Amino acid sequence: HMEILLKEMGADITVDEATNSVDMKESEIKGKKIFVCGDFTEAVYYLAQGLLSGRVECKNVGVNPTRTRVLQLFKRMGAKIKITNRRMLCGEPIADIVAEKSDLKAILVTDEEAYSVFDELPALAIIMGMANGESVIAEHKAIKDLDADLFDEISEAMRSVGGNCRRFSSPSAAGIAIKGVERYRGGNVKCGYSASVGMAAAIALTVSEEGGEIEDEYVIDAQYPQFSETLGANSFA
């Protein structure tokens, strides 16, 4: 994102993806009006709400292909996802994304796929929790380096709201197996230090029978201050 923004402001900058290097020459940087697109990862949690409960539209979302891989997994599950109004603003691809309540089916997510959607894994797990059949997310060893407790936190949160989630680990394979339930029961959830796990659990509570609370909601508020206020709406800009 920084390279794109610098180019927009007049920088003579070249990005070589083959060597993963950036070459920037002395340049005259000029100020300009900048449009900041919506964060895709945050949008995914609202979209998960739409897939489980009804129509949700997220507007002006950044849709850089390196960030949107989780949508392919959603679609493999049978999710009704539509991307509209694609355009470029300040060098960034943005669009509006619509998610509608869907009849979801279980899938297998390989460890490489899981690593590529690391930031969206809790949201993916929550929609798997109401899919038909048993889904599996394999754990890539690099995920342990990024967040050693993530899969344990996802499993605990899902069980807290009445989901059927089993953590497995052996010398040959590790991950979580999620068997879909018709509806989450609800309950109180501790998200620890993971805002994404807390956000996913909050989505589950909105579609649960009894509701519940995120006991350490301040963790979510610190990272996404508007999340709790807007949860339950059906349009986000």
Regions found by a protein language model. Name each.
Residues 1-237:
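Short, structured segments at the rim of ligand-binding sites
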